[in-house]
Structures are given as structure tokens and as C-alpha cells.
Amino acid sequence: MKTVKFKLISALLLLIIAFSLTNCIISKDDKKEYDQLKARCELESQNKSTVRQVFEAINARDFEKMRTFYAPEYKMTGPRLPNAYTLDSLIQYIQRDIAVFPDWKYSVENMVAQGDTVAVKIAQFGVQANDYMGIKPKANQISRAAIFITVFSNGKLKETWILQDNLGFME
């Protein structure tokens, strides 16, 4: 009697194991799709990390480090930019802002990535220490919101479209 129960339990366990294993087998198409999704998620995560590191480098005033994140052909455009900025002209623009607002910082508020594109909402803020476009320094903190949409190529920032709240900035 014990032998029959043992054989039945053993057979049942083998069936359960066999059934479980057949359900765990992933088709080649499913594996390929999973691998592509995983690679895309890793790319998006890396691109978001790079965007964060760019703003950290700017906040640290480390423009040489900032340069390492950009492709040689980088350009920045936007509705209020009459000419595209190259990386060199972008750094000059940031340095001019820092000359007026020595404590100027960028704070990443939100970020979304899809494929090779990252959209980031930032807040910029600082206290004006020098004249800015004819405006005398004030003791209060000034802030400006901005949206950057950046496209990557081979892990480097290739182009950025920017929209800043310059009107609110001038108030």
C-alpha cells in the first residue's frame, strides 16, 4: 500500500514538474522581444543618467566634464533662439548667466525617456549680482522654468530643443 501511494505521489510530482517546465519555456520570438525591450530600457535609463550628469557638471561649473557628454555636431534650437547653439556657444551662454547670477543652479524636476529621446523639465534659479540686459541687480532669487527635449546618438547628446519661460524670468 505504501509503495502504491509513493508511486502515485511520485508520478503526480513528475507531472507537476513537467507541466511547470513546459510553461516556463519562452519562445525565440518572445525572448527576442524581451531582449529588445530590456536593451531599450537600459538605453533610456543611461540617457536619463547622462542628462542628470550634464546638469550636475553645469552646477559644479565643470565645463570640461560637460563637454564629454556631447557629440561633436551638437546643436540646440528653440522657438526663441534665432540661431542654433553649438556646444561652444551653449557653454558661453551658460557662463554669461553665471557671471550675472553666480549661484545659478539647475534642478531636474521631471524626466521621461523614449528610445533615443529624453524630455526633461528643469527649474533654474539664482540671485542676480550684476546688470542683466539693463536690469539692475535685486536681492531676491530669480527663477526660470524650462523644458529640454534631447536626442542622443551613440550615447552622446546630439541635439536639444528648448523652451524657457523667459517672460516670467524678466518679471
Segments (PLM) and residue ranges:
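Bacterial Sec-dependent N-terminal signal peptides
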Residues: 1-34
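Short, low-complexity N-terminal intrinsically disordered segments enriched in polar/charged residues
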Residues: 24-72
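Low-complexity, intrinsically disordered terminal/linker segments enriched in charged
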Residues: 30-33, 158-171
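Hydrophobic pocket/interface hotspot
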Residues: 51-54, 65-67, 74, 90, ...
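Carbohydrate-interacting regions of secretory-pathway proteins
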Residues: 56, 68, 113, 168-170
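A solvent-exposed, acidic/Ser-Thr-rich amphipathic alpha-helical stretch
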Residues: 63-115
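Short beta-strand segments enriched in hydrophobic/aromatic residues
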Residues: 70, 112, 124-126, 163-164
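Exposed beta-sheet edge and beta->alpha loop/turn motif
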Residues: 123-157
